[in-house]
């Protein structure tokens, strides 16, 4: 299966690379050199990378494999959202706005926001990956 960025952009709540860059820049600016925030960010990157691996392999799986792995994927996705929330909560406690978290949206407001949060997690894994060369 060949997937393209253009196809992705046609999906509900798709986030452009430019928007993801902006959100990431806002996030990094608020984290700054705060040791605890950096630790939370590292934990987020670890789970985002794990989730991105699962998600990137998803189109390659047959129906039985998807059924077998679906609960694990959902659990990992839930953990990604929890880690975003933990980082945002901590930053707010430090007097930051964490407006980037609101920009990603909340599942309670629109179920597609869950997918957008997963998309952004994949973006973070992508950025980490290309910087690892």
Language model: regions and residue ranges:
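Short intrinsically disordered terminal tails
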Residues: 1-6, 129-133
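Amphipathic coiled-coil alpha-helices
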Residues: 16, 23, 40, 47-50, ...
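Charged, low-complexity interaction regions
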Residues: 29-39, 56-69, 96-100
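Amphipathic alpha-helical binding modules
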Residues: 74-133
